[in-house]
């Protein structure tokens, strides 16, 4: 990290890149003895962006530590924001993943899930520890995500690869085919016959 003083951070306020209170929190952490106590996910995300801007590894570590704590209180209203923070910064959090796996049906019924890109949907659903009653539940989640979307055939194939088709009945496949756009139907049939076999943690 290049040397800077308090006035350098004060000048940063005039650039309108970061919020004034976020800069103050960073300043007190870097030059004072104040710890990061905020429970606001949005504030922590902005603090982490500032830490990267300043190239301050200590501040980054403290923000991650605080986010790990806040993550223990994750819920359906903030899961996607927390998930995006970890994914976009190449970070992992076992509690976050456990929450997603155990609450996948509730999560996939949120508007936040429907707004995810294909990579995030695959990252979330292509997990052997997801707890569902049957594989058709996962297929329906993908179909719901695809509603009102037009993805190219490569992305369609990619997202369908999260389905373990060995555990999908032919009648369930037929029902799914009726729900998707015509241009995807042959691809879905082909994937079904490939019979992706990796099991999940089915909840009995």
From Swiss-Prot:
Expression induction or repression: Expressed in the early phase of the viral replicative cycle.
Name of the protein this chain belongs to: Protein OPG030
Keyword Protein biosynthesis set for record: no
A Pfam family of this chain: BACK
PANTHER family membership: KELCH-LIKE PROTEIN 22, LD33804P
Family the UniProt entry places it in: Belongs to the orthopoxvirus OPG030 family.
Domain BACK: 95-177
SMART domains named in the record: BACK (SM00875)
Keyword terms of this UniProt record: Early protein
InterPro entries, per the entry: BACK (IPR011705), Orthopox_C5 (IPR009177)
């Amino acid at each position: 990290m290049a040397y800077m003083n308090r006035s350098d951070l004060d000048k940063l306020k005039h650039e309108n890149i970061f919020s004034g209170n976020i800069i103050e929190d960073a300043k007190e952490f870097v030059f004072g003895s104040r710890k990061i106590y905020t429970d606001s996910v949005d504030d922590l995300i902005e603090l982490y962006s500032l830490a990267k801007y300043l190239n301050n590894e200590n501040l980054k570590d403290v923000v991650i530590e605080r986010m790990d704590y806040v993550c223990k209180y994750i819920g359906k209203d903030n899961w996607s924001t927390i998930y995006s923070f970890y994914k976009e910064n190449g970070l992992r959090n076992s509690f976050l993943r456990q929450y997603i796996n155990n609450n996948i049906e509730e999560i996939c019924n949120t508007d936040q899930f429907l707004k995810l890109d294909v990579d995030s949907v695959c990252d979330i659903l292509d997990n052997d520890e997801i707890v569902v009653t049957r594989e058709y539940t996962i297929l329906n989640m993908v179909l719901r995500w695809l509603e009102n979307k037009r993805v190219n055939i490569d992305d369609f194939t990619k997202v369908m690869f999260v389905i373990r088709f060995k555990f999908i009945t032919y009648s369930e496949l037929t029902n799914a085919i009726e729900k998707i756009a015509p241009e995807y139907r042959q691809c879905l049939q082909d994937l079904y016959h490939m019979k992706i076999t990796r099991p999940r943690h089915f909840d009995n």
